[in-house]
Curated annotation (Swiss-Prot):
The modification 4-aspartylphosphate is found at D54. The keyword Zinc-finger does not apply. Member of the two-component regulatory system NtrB/NtrC, which controls expression of the nitrogen-regulated (ntr) genes in response to nitrogen limitation. Phosphorylated NtrC binds directly to DNA and stimulates the formation of open promoter-sigma54-RNA polymerase complexes. Keywords: Activator, ATP-binding, Cytoplasm, DNA-binding, Nitrogen fixation, Nucleotide-binding, Phosphoprotein, Repressor, Transcription, Transcription regulation, Two-component regulatory system. This is DNA-binding transcriptional regulator NtrC. One of its GO terms (cellular component) is cytoplasm. PROSITE patterns: RESPONSE_REGULATORY (PS50110), SIGMA54_INTERACT_1 (PS00675), SIGMA54_INTERACT_2 (PS00676), SIGMA54_INTERACT_3 (PS00688), SIGMA54_INTERACT_4 (PS50045).
Length: 480
C-alpha cells in the first residue's frame, strides 16, 4: 500500500474533496487548503512529501510560490494543475521546477500514477531555469486534449538535448514546435538554424549542411559555412528529412555517430555541438521499406517521436486559432475583426487540408480584404467554396478574371474605410497573399521541380528558392 503525506491546494472545494477521497483510497495521508498562504506555511514547516496545487488561487499565483518552495525544499515534488490549458502554462510549470503539469479536467488514475512515480523516485535537487513571465507571442495555440499532450511532452523536453522527430502533415506547425523547443530550452542563447531538404537542389544539400571549401567544386569561389557550423551551440532543424538524398543521409548518420564532420572538399574533421530536431510529413517507415531512407538514421533521429495532429482532429481549437491570427493581424495595423458564432461553426466543420497554415492564410485574407467588422457565415462560405474549373484561353481571360477578382476585393476593402485610408503596407500584404498560391500552384504543376517552376514563373532559381523559404511553402517532389 502506498504511503506518504500529500498537501493539496485548490480554491475549489469540490476539487479538494475529490482529490482527498481519491488519494486517501490510494493509501496516502492528505491535507488540503484553499489558499497559497496555508500551503506555504505547511511547506515551510517541513510538512508533506508531495504538493498538488492549482495555479490560480485567491491570494497568490502558484508560479510565484513555486520558486520559494523549491528554494526551501528542493527535494519536494510539486504537481501543478491548471484550467488555463495553454502552451505557456506547461512551459512555466516546467521552468519553475514543477514535477508535472496536469491540465484540468484530468484523469484521477493518471494523477495517482504520477503521484506514485514522484514519491518513488530518489530525491534530488531540481535545477531551476527561471524564464520570463510574459505571455505575449505564444508560439503554440490550442486547448484540445491533443495539444495538451504535446505541451506536456514539450515541457519535459525543454531541459534536455534529446533528438526529436516531429511528424505531421504540411501546415500543422512542425517548425513552430521546433522553435519552441529551442526558444524555451537550454540552448535558447544559441542560434536556431533551419534547413528544408525539399527546398534545396539535391546536389547542393551536402554543401548546405556541411559547408564547402574554396575550389571544392565549380562555382565555389569562396569558403562557405554550412548549417552545422552556423548552428554551433544551438539547434539545427532538419525540415522534410524524408527528402534528404541517400548520400547526404550517410554523411548525417556519421555526424550523429561521431559528433564531427568534414566540409565538402575539406579533410580536417570539425567537432560539432548542436541539438538535432527533424521533421517530416512522410511515413519514414514506408520510405525505409522502399529503400529511400536509412533505417539506422531513422533510429538515430527518432529518439523522441512527436506527432502533430492535423487541424481536423482538433477542430475545437479553431476559435482560439482564429482569435490568435486576427490579433496578430491587428498588431500589424489591420482593422479589428470578430467572427460570429455561426461562422465559427462553419470553420470548425471544414476539413482544413492545409491545416493551421491554411487557416492562418484565410484569416489574413479576411483581415486585409473585407471591410466588414463582423465576419459572417456567407463570407466564410464564399472563401471556402472552390469555384468550378473553367477552360480559359491563353490570350487573357485568366488575367482578366484574376484582375477583376482582385479589383472587386480591393474596392470593397477601400470602401470599408470611407474617406480614410487603410493601414500602411497594403502593397506587401496583397503581394504576399497572391504570391503564396501562385508559387504553390507553379510548384504543384511542375511536381516540385524548382528549375521548371522558376522557368514557368519567369524567376531566377535563387529568387524562387528565397521566396519558398520566406513564404514557408512546402515543396513536395513527385514522379510522373
Amino acid at each position: 500500500m502506498p504511503t506518504g503525506s500529500i498537501l493539496v491546494a485548490d480554491d475549489d472545494a469540490a476539487i479538494r474533496t475529490v482529490l482527498n477521497q481519491a488519494l486517501s483510497r490510494a493509501g496516502y495521508e492528505v491535507r488540503s487548503c484553499g489558499n497559497a498562504a496555508t500551503l506555504w506555511r505547511w511547506v515551510s514547516q517541513g510538512d508533506g512529501d508531495l504538493v498538488i496545487t492549482d495555479v490560480v488561487m485567491p491570494d497568490e499565483n502558484a508560479f510565484d510560490l513555486l520558486p520559494r518552495i523549491k528554494k526551501a525544499r528542493p527535494d519536494l515534488p510539486v504537481i501543478v494543475m491548471s484550467a488555463q490549458n495553454t502552451f505557456m502554462t506547461a512551459i512555466r510549470a516546467s521552468e519553475r521546477g514543477a514535477y508535472e503539469y496536469l491540465p484540468k479536467p484530468f484523469d484521477l488514475k493518471e494523477l495517482i500514477s504520477i503521484v506514485g512515480r514522484a514519491l518513488a523516485e530518489p530525491k534530488k535537487a531540481e535545477k531551476l531555469a527561471l524564464g520570463s513571465d510574459e505571455q505575449e507571442n505564444i508560439p503554440l495555440v490550442g486547448r484540445s486534449a491533443a495539444m495538451q499532450e504535446i505541451y506536456r511532452l514539450l515541457a519535459r523536453l525543454m531541459q534536455t538535448d534529446l533528438t526529436v522527430m516531429i511528424a505531421g502533415e504540411s501546415g500543422t506547425g512542425k517548425e513552430l514546435v521546433a522553435r519552441a523547443l529551442h526558444d524555451y530550452g537550454k540552448r535558447r542563447n544559441g542560434p536556431f538554424v533551419a534547413i528544408n531538404m525539399a527546398a534545396i537542389p539535391r546536389d547542393l544539400i551536402e554543401s548546405e549542411l556541411f559547408g564547402h571549401e574554396k575550389g571544392s567544386f565549380t562555382g565555389a569561389t569562396t569558403r562557405n559555412a554550412g548549417r552545422f557550423e552556423q548552428a554551433e551551440g544551438g539547434t539545427l532543424f532538419l525540415d522534410e528529412i524524408g527528402d534528404m538524398p541517400m548520400e547526404a543521409q550517410t554523411r548525417l548518420l556519421r555526424v550523429l555517430q561521431q559528433g564531427e564532420y568534414t566540409t565538402v572538399g575539406g579533410r580536417t574533421p570539425i567537432k560539432t555541438d548542436v541539438r538535432i530536431i527533424a521533421a517530416t510529413n512522410k511515413d519514414l517507415r514506408t520510405l525505409i521499406q522502399q529503400g529511400l531512407f536509412r533505417e539506422d538514421l531513422f533510429f538515430r533521429l527518432n529518439v523522441v517521436p512527436l506527432r502533430l495532429p492535423p487541424l481536423r482532429e482538433r477542430s475545437e481549437d479553431v476559435p482560439d486559432l482564429v482569435r490568435h491570427f486576427f490579433l496578430q493581424a491587428e498588431r500589424e495595423g489591420l482593422p479589428a475583426k470578430q467572427v460570429d458564432s455561426a461562422a465559427l461553426d462553419r470553420l470548425k466543420r471544414y476539413r482544413w487540408p492545409g491545416n493551421v497554415r491554411e487557416l492562418e492564410n484565410l484569416v489574413r485574407r479576411l483581415a486585409a480584404l473585407y471591410p466588414q467588422e463582423i465576419i459572417t457565415p456567407s463570407i466564410i462560405e464564399a472563401e471556402l467554396s472552390e469555384p468550378a474549373p473553367s477552360a480559359l484561353s491563353e490570350d487573357g481571360p485568366v488575367d482578366a478574371t484574376l484582375g477583376a477578382s482582385v479589383e472587386r476585393h480591393l474596392n470593397g476593402y477601400f470602401s470599408g474605410f470611407g474617406e480614410d485610408l487603410p493601414p500602411p503596407g497594403l502593397y506587401h500584404r496583397i503581394l504576399r497573399d497572391v504570391e503564396y498560391p501562385l508559387l504553390s500552384a507553379a510548384l504543384a504543376a511542375t511536381r516540385g521541380n524548382q528549375i521548371k517552376a522558376a522557368e514557368l514563373l519567369g524567376l531566377n532559381r535563387n529568387t524562387l528558392r528565397k521566396k519558398i523559404r520566406d513564404l514557408d511553402i512546402q515543396v513536395i517532389r513527385t514522379s510522373r
